[in-house]
Amino acid sequence: MQRLRMYVMRADVTLEDVSDNFVRIGISGEQMVEELGKVMNAVPAEDDQVMHSGDITVLRVPGVQPRFEAYISAHEAARKLWDTLNVRGAPVGESAWRLLEILAGLPTVFAATSELFVPQMANLQLVNGVSFKKGCYPGQEIVARMQYLGTLKRRMYLGRIATDEPAFPGGELFTEADSEQVVGRLVDAQPHPDGGQAALAVIQITAAEASDLHLGSSEGAAFTLGTLPYPFES
């Protein structure tokens, strides 16, 4: 919060940490649209659309099935929403939500990866995650230069790691041809119901095209590229 306050340019703006004032619930599933409608005046129909109803704010987020994030500012409203969703839904935990984020091609930044990527490497320009028309933030000039003048050499890919062993953000990827050169880093990885780990990774484009990627070493678990739910820029 102290670092964020450095970028407040107007005297009448204040920043305050209100994390403890809200409950956040991730919601996913075809049936959940109907269940949300029982406590909301209207349910967001488009990705990135936001709806408010009393003490509940709901944001629709991209996904292979309907997904929402609910932010609730009152205890009773949170309890009512939870009890409503719990009839046809079930709590599944953070790992399941992170898997859905991975399958949607949405990057999450962790401490281990906070200084590794510029936004374009993590595909943020493809998912409405960064604006080149407005805003002021650290590194803005570098980001804009990459967008308008630079050549992107790394980008984020969806893939599957052929191991049930946990994989972690920042994990290194290698090719069989070069055991010394790190060609990619994991953004996140979570167990997939069909086995192995679903993962997002920022990888050198030339290395990704070679398709002989491995986690941890050139002889580690194979990393097989999948298909993101959105196209790369042409």
Where are these predicted regions, by residue range?
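Glycine-rich, small/acidic residue-mixed loop/short-helix segments
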Residues: 122-130, 144-234
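Acidic, low-complexity central loop/insert segments
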Residues: 1-104
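Short acidic/glycine-rich loop or secondary-structure boundary segments that cap or lie
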Residues: 79-80, 102, 109-113, 152-156
